[in-house]
Amino acid sequence: GFVEARRYIAHDAAPRYLSLYSTKTFEVLDSPAYRAALANQTPWSKANIARFQNMIRSVARITISRGRGRGAALGLVRLRGATPDLRDRLASRFDPELHDGVIGISLLEGDPSLSRSLTNPSDDSGAGDWFILIEGTSIDAVASLTPSHFSGVLNDATVVSSGTYRLMFDLAAADL
């Protein structure tokens, strides 16, 4: 069910690496096959997951997506305490054409029931967090929108973190 995988390295962010995966449908991530794969990790997967530090795992729906393409740089703003009305307020700020070098802005809303940590399942403090992704041609372009550009509409939502990443690679479905 996976159709794309992207890997980033931090420019000015934590954690050091960021991986984004896309699926044909959101339901793939709640399917018996996916749950079985998570429950029966290979020895290689277990060894690699054990090395993860400062890991954030979020299974999220893309609820707003404006613009086209993938950028060489990514701005990321992580929000906690978001409410459904925030989605509409944020949408009014998601216009990549107004910002030089920004080619896309998306909102990803974490699903608390599917976003449990693989390394510490009892820690679900950020399972329902939302993420604003800003795709751009340069670090400077995406940094101009993180997070002050959105501060006037956040209300009670808290910015947990923000930062910038550089794209390392992008794999399409045929590559996976």
Where would I find each of the regions flagged by the language model?
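Short aromatic-glycine motifs in intrinsically disordered, low-complexity regions
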Residues: 44, 92-97
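Short, well-ordered beta-strand segments in beta-rich or mixed alpha/beta enzyme
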Residues: 9-35, 69-80, 87, 115-146
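Glycine-rich beta-strand-turn "strand-cap" elements at beta-sheet edges
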Residues: 6-15, 39-72, 100-127, 147-176
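Ser/Thr-Pro-rich, acidic low-complexity intrinsically disordered regions of eukaryotic RNA-binding
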Residues: 84-92
